């Protein structure tokens, strides 16, 4: 039960943060491009890389922290289902070029952000 509570609490916080980032991105960039989803997925990828390395080095891979932060917080913060819906919406509006740019940017920059998080954690260790 404790593990479920850790995931639930982290997920609730992550979901609220995702919503706030989405609102802010819509105000800054407008609704034409899913900047909020891109931002949370890139930030989440970076944070996941940083977190995995820090947990391994400083906390011995603590299962409780991993459940709270990786599964809960970052699971609630990032969103693959919204990402795929955004790609489909752009494509269905006939904006295939923008859909491809968003798809490629999300995947490539997401991987880059993950590796940047790993590198930062290793540098700070």
What does each model-identified segment do?
Residues 1-125:
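Membrane-interface helix-loop junctions in multi-pass transporters/channels
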